[in-house]
Amino acid sequence: MSQLLPAVEIETGSGDQPECAVIWLHGLGADGHDFEPIVDELDLDDLPPIRFVFPHAPTRPVTINGGYVMRAWYDIVSPDFSQRREDAQGVHESAQQIEALIARENARGIPDQRIVLAGFSQGGAIALHSGLRHKQRLAGILALSTYVPLADTLAAEAHTANRDVPIFMAHGHGDTVIPYDFAQRSCALLQAQGYPLQWHPYFCEHTIAMEEIRDIDVWLHKVLAPNA
């Protein structure tokens, strides 16, 4: 098992043992605290107790930022997200670390089918990459302001266990970090391969809109409902 990443953890409920988990991955240069406030913005009182896990990505030099060392799930070599220049090794290493976090939740009593993988930007890319290759059915994948990394390998590497996993994918029309049309191509790729994907566009930039938070809340109530 890969060494466990340090993480911020927040549990909902009144001290009851969590029955579900949301592993939420931050974006480039941020850390696990970045999305910590979103827990209070979601209306989760009528769901089973949830453990939110916000891991801190490892630090590494990022080529697009002049080699500056920052928290990143993988290196970004080019702003055009060319598949020929993707950091496949970094993506695979991060996927292994996410597998270790899932295994820890299993050890703490939460089965795979009650775990959501979530992420923003780079974190969303790793959530998609890891979730679609995971060997046990997950509750869902929440992919915000992101894209499918190593897209050419997905068809061959995707695991049948998650062929029908619910995917919530959202993007801002004004995103200049990961262009909207690039994210749309990732959406089209997943839909062409038969994944049950919900596509949510918003009038915002590279961020999360208030309307988006409400839609995430609705989606979480579907995939983490007691009888889901």
List each model region and its residues.
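C-terminal catalytic histidine-bearing segment of alpha/beta-hydrolase fold enzymes
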Residues: 181-228
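Short, proline-enriched alpha-helix->beta-strand connector loops that line the catalytic pocket
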Residues: 20, 162-167, 193-195
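Primarily recognizes the serine-hydrolase "nucleophile elbow" in alpha/beta-hydrolase
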Residues: 111-162
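Alpha/beta-hydrolase-fold catalytic nucleophile elbow
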Residues: 55-56, 118, 142-145, 170, ...
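Serine-hydrolase catalytic machinery in alpha/beta-hydrolase-like enzymes
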Residues: 2-113
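Conserved alpha/beta-hydrolase "nucleophile elbow" surrounding the catalytic nucleophile
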Residues: 26-28, 115-120, 172
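Short alpha-helix in the alpha/beta-hydrolase fold that links the catalytic acid
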Residues: 35-40, 155, 179-189
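Short beta-strand/loop motif that positions the catalytic acidic residue
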Residues: 168-171, 175
